[in-house]
Each structure stands twice: as C-alpha cells, then as structure tokens.
Amino acid sequence: MHDAHYHYSKEINTLQNEYGISGICNVANEKEFELVQQKHLFYSCGVHPWNASLDTLNSMFPLLKNAPIIGEIGMDSVWCDVDLKIQKEVFEKQLQLAQALNKPV
C-alpha cells in the first residue's frame, strides 16, 4: 500500500512499519526536512496555501530546489485566511520552479 501524501508523526511511522505502507512525506519547514533526511524518507516540499507568503517561499527555496517533488501546493478559498492574490503568486512561483527544474507537482 502507498500513501501519496502524509505528514510525519511517530504514530504514522509506526503504522507504516507495522503494515508495510510506503509513501510521500510532505515537508513544510526546515525541521521536517531534517527529519525526513535522518529517516531516509521519500518526500515532497511546498508552501501550503495556509502558509503562503513571499517570505515563507523565499525561506523554503533551498528545500524546494532540492526536493524530488514540489507539493503540497495550491490555493484555498474556503478554509484559508491568506489573501487569494498572495496564494496565487506563491502557487505560480512554485509551479514555475517545478517547471524550470523539471520536477513533478
């Protein structure tokens, strides 16, 4: 079984090991990046719409550049308080980066 998108926790790690589940761990910050590197997990990296800002995007640029997959990215007009214009700009920049580096989203 494969989980296409999860966020790391000890509980999830235990279940994955117990049931032989593999997956793509979503990284949203440097601390999570260090964790997936230590655990040798396959991962994606992206600025989630809830955290969308140019500052966040700039701080995550090195992680995005080195990630095998760009994600979890997008836009959220229902559950998110971040202005849609900002979300759109951050989303588009991540798509442009993925295209320039030939990475899947």
Predicted regions and their residues:
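Mid-domain alpha/beta scaffold segments of enzyme catalytic cores
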Residues: 1-105
